[in-house]
Amino acid sequence: MLDWIETRPIVKALLENERNSNSGKYNGERCFLTAYQIAILVDKENPEVRGKLPIGGKGVGPDSFSRQIAWHLSQEIDGEYFEGKLEIGFFSQSGLEDFTFDGGHQPSLNEFSMFRLREI
């Protein structure tokens, strides 16, 4: 089980610091990150947080690190911790069957939630 109180500040810092690097009009704006990306980035820097939970992806099932992060973040949309800046979006599933990642992982073809912190 995920300790959200321990994980939440790590996720908030990731969302605060993830900005696009385009050189155009939108340079430096905060980007959306999928729950899967957040899980990978948290695990990369803080592997003890994930514990024995699988990261997620195709065939892993509902009890994964990325699913728990997505659930907790979705509960925080209107909460005070993220100061009303947390935004959720959904990535189209079209074409995802062709995605592959290092280690042979494939994304789940369920809803693909994405999160970012709005600039206010």
Label each residue range with its predicted role.
Residues 32-43:
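An amphipathic alpha-helix signature
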Residues 1-29, 36, 48-120:
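Phospho-regulated, low-complexity intrinsically disordered regions of nuclear gene-regulatory
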